[in-house]
């Protein structure tokens, strides 16, 4: 053994080849400070052994290296610039040391080689991957850029255009794509990985492969003609900005860094990378996106823990077909859990199966599936007009019409047809789980399972705990949602649960602006372009359906009359009474048609303005800051109330619910990250300015106390 630490082992193989194996004590290899130090020491030991003729890097885990240890980032990024720069420079000495060894080197890549893992393999002369490999530099998704030489080495290995596409998108690349651009040199079956890597390394040692020229290319400036470089970077800037937009600076920084470093050698190019990394690491965007990543890990960790308590789900059933039922059936079947789709009407079953078939066909068209897999998934969906096939289900998802009496009747009915220990859930967006539980003989096996529409796209599932729901029931539904590929958050029962409860105060703020004469299109523009929502409130209401919104608003008003009760008609009432339900009947705040490519098209409609003007009078202009304040303050305060009341367990879960369930702008991190960034005291002062608008604008006593103590929600958690 040449070297051994808790994360790295180096042994000498025959023919004087050193084998460095990453083998951390946890479930995955990642580049934390300890691993970087170990790699440095291992390379020193290798360099001191004069008999070594080549080096092979491998991993003892199912993944090569998943990246840097992101849990270290927030603390590290809070350090002084000099400390952060010193960390970057010291880490890069290690990667340079790997690249500068006096003999050929190769990486044998299995599973994920992401971020620092990808930067490690780029520092070796050759790269062989097996068919399980996924390679990429996802740092821009965290609001930063690669910091261990990724922007320097990748363009010199795969070319500028390919490197720009890889790094700015942050996407994992399949091994076939990596082979096509030259990021890897060979692609083999998993069982052939080490033997193929050793053969290539021996060929390099025997001078059959020119490793010196390859290495020299990575150390030198990019060989790019000046005119071609100008055109390439100008095109890239336009394309990247179009996708990333102004709120996400990291992808544009990548283009700038590679452009600035193009004429520099490795040392100069690394300095350019370090300065850009330093600048981005200090941004609020990076703090927010890293926070989302860590929150996601926390939520997934809770789901994994729930799996230990959970009842095994081998089969499922959904009651109510149609678009929603079909979406749930597709999601369950495509992730490996067979499901019965039960309805009382054959046309509804046909619609549900049609929805599942359409989603699967789209996967085949994109190359993400094939006809054989599509057939297998469809075979996992059993349509039924009676309860006979439902009897074997371990979990039942009731997804019938959003009406308490209908749901209660169906729930009572299905309880008679399933096993004693089957779990029953309701996919309701507004109806109290405690109320629905009254229709069941065994309410302990019942909870809510709120999917968001469209099911296949929206990552969130709210698992709603009723007062009688058992821990096993909740854990089993969390585990089933995770198995379906969803992110579950557990919330306690209340009107609107969590997501809808905080959404409707936002809509109330929007309605208040319209009642004061604001232009809904102007509000949408501010909330989309400036605040960063994917849709403004008017457009979102049209997509949700103003009939659905009208019903949910009534539920919220009944549940929280002191804050959400209405004294008169609002804009949602106006649209509902005019039977302008949104996209579903092609007219809401906007009017909808189909363009030449068959895609929905949104246009302003004079009728909407006439209806609103008739109710609220002449239009008037509002400043952007007031629009943002009047829509966001109610949502933020209601989110805080949910935390204080125990509806949601933590700021992290609340923020994930908002980002995954509503599309809250990720670069702002969620309500609690946004509050902490803004400063709770600053928010309280802003809310007080609008407190005269009613209860939705009045902060809680606990918020005032936190503000007075200069506290923050994540620090408190």
From Swiss-Prot:
GO terms for cellular component: fatty acid beta-oxidation multienzyme complex. Residues 1-189 are annotated as: Enoyl-CoA hydratase/isomerase. Its EC number is 4.2.1.17, 5.1.2.3, 5.3.3.8, 1.1.1.35. It holds the Pfam family 3HCDH_N. Residues 311-717 are annotated as: 3-hydroxyacyl-CoA dehydrogenase. GO terms for biological process: fatty acid beta-oxidation. GO terms for molecular function: 3-hydroxybutyryl-CoA epimerase activity; delta(3)-delta(2)-enoyl-CoA isomerase activity; enoyl-CoA hydratase activity; long-chain-3-hydroxyacyl-CoA dehydrogenase activity; NAD+ binding. Substrate binds at residues 296, 500, 660. The record marks 119, 139 as: Important for catalytic activity. The active site is at 450 (for 3-hydroxyacyl-coa dehydrogenase activity). InterPro entries: 3-OHacyl-CoA_DH_CS (IPR006180), 3-OHacyl-CoA_DH_NAD-bd (IPR006176), 3HC_DH_C (IPR006108), 6-PGluconate_DH-like_C_sf (IPR008927), ClpP/crotonase-like_dom_sf (IPR029045), Enoyl-CoA_hyd/isom_CS (IPR018376), Enoyl-CoA_hydra/iso (IPR001753), FA_oxidation_alpha_subunit (IPR050136). Gene3D superfamilies: 1.10.1040.50, 2-enoyl-CoA Hydratase, Chain A, domain 1 (3.90.226.10), NAD(P)-binding Rossmann-like Domain (3.40.50.720). SUPFAM superfamilies: 6-phosphogluconate dehydrogenase C-terminal domain-like, ClpP/crotonase, NAD(P)-binding Rossmann-fold domains. In the N-terminal section; belongs to the enoyl-CoA hydratase/isomerase family. Heterotetramer of two alpha chains (FadB) and two beta chains (FadA). Involved in the aerobic and anaerobic degradation of long-chain fatty acids via beta-oxidation cycle. Catalyzes the formation of 3-oxoacyl-CoA from enoyl-CoA via L-3-hydroxyacyl-CoA. It can also use D-3-hydroxyacyl-CoA and cis-3-enoyl-CoA as substrate. This is Fatty acid oxidation complex subunit alpha.
């Amino acid at each position: 053994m040449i070297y051994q630490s808790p994360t790295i082992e180096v042994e000498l193989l025959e023919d004087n080849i050193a084998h460095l194996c990453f083998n951390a004590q946890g479930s995955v290899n990642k580049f934390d400070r300890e691993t970087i130090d170990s790699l440095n020491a291992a390379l020193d030991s290798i360099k001191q052994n004069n008999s070594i003729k080549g080096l092979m890097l491998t991993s003892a885990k199912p993944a090569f290296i998943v990246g840097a240890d992101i849990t270290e980032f927030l603390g590290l990024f809070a350090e002084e610039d000099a400390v952060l720069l010193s960390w970057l420079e010291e880490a890069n000495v290690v990667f340079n040391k790997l690249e500068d060894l006096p003999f050929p080197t190769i990486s044998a890549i299995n599973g994920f080689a992401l971020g620092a893992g990808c930067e490690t393999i780029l520092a070796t002369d050759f790269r062989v991957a097996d068919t399980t490999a996924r390679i990429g530099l996802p740092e821009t998704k965290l609001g930063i850029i690669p910091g261990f030489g990724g922007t320097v080495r990748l363009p010199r290995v795969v070319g500028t255009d390919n490197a720009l596409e890889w790094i700015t998108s942050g996407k994992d690349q399949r091994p076939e794509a990596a082979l096509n651009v030259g990021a890897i040199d060979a692609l083999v079956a998993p069982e052939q990985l080490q033997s193929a890597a050793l053969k290539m390394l021996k060929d390099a040692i025997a001078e059959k492969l020119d490793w010196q020229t390859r290495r020299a290319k990575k150390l030198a400036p990019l060989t790019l003609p000046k005119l071609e470089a100008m055109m390439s970077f100008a095109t890239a800037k336009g394309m990247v900005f179009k996708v990333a937009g102004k709120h996400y600076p990291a992808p544009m920084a990548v283009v700038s860094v590679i452009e600035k470093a193009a004429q520099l050698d490795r040392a100069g190019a690394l300095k350019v990378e370090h300065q850009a990394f330093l600048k981005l690491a200090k941004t609020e965007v990076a703090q927010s996106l890293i926070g989302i990543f860590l929150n996601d890990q926390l939520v997934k960790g809770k789901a994994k823990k729930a799996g230990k308590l959970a009842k095994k789900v081998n089969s499922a059933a959904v009651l109510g077909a149609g678009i929603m039922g079909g979406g749930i059936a597709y999601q369950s079947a495509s992730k490996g859990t067979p499901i019965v789709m039960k309805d009382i009407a054959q046309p509804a079953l046909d619609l549900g199966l049609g929805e599942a078939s359409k989603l699967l066909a789209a996967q085949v068209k994109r190359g993400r599936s094939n006809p054989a897999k599509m057939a297998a998934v469809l075979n996992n969906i059993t349509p039924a007009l009676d309860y006979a096939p439902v009897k074997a289900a371990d979990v039942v998802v009731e997804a019938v019409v959003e009406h308490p009496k209908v749901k209660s009747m169906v729930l009572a009915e299905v309880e008679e047809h399933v096993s004693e220990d089957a779990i029953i859930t309701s996919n309701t967006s507004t109806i109290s789980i405690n109320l629905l539980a009254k229709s069941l003989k065994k309410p302990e096996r019942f909870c809510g399972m709120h999917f968001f529409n469209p099911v296949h796209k929206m990552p969130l599932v709210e698992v709603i705990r009723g007062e009688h729901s058992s821990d096993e029931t909740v854990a089993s539904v969390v585990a089933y949602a995770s198995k379906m590929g969803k992110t579950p958050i557990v919330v306690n029962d209340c009107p609107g649960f969590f997501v809808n409860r905080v959404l409707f105060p936002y809509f109330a703020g929007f309605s208040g602006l319209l009642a004061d004469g604001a232009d809904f299109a102007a509000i949408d523009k501010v909330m989309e372009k400036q605040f960063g929502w994917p849709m403004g409130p008017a457009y979102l209401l049209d997509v949700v359906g103003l009939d659905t919104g009208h019903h949910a608003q009534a539920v919220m008003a009944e549940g929280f009359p002191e804050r959400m009760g209405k004294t008169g008609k609002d804009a949602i009432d106006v649209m509902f009474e005019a039977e302008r339900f949104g996209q579903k009947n092609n007219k809401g705040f906007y009017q909808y048609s189909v363009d030449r490519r068959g895609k929905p098209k949104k246009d302003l409609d004079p009728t909407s303005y006439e209806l609103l003007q008739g109710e609220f009078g002449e239009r008037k202009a509002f400043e952007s800051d007031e629009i943002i304040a009047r829509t966001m303050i109610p949502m933020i305060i209601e989110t805080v109330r949910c935390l204080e009341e125990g509806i949601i367990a933590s700021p992290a879960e609340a923020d994930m619910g908002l980002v995954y369930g509503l599309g809250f702008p990720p670069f702002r991190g969620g309500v609690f990250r946004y509050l902490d960034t803004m400063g709770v005291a600053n928010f309280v002062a802003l809310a007080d300015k609008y407190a005269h608008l009613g209860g939705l604008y009045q902060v809680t006593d606990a918020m005032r106390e936190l503000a007075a103590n200069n506290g923050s929600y994540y620090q408190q958690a």
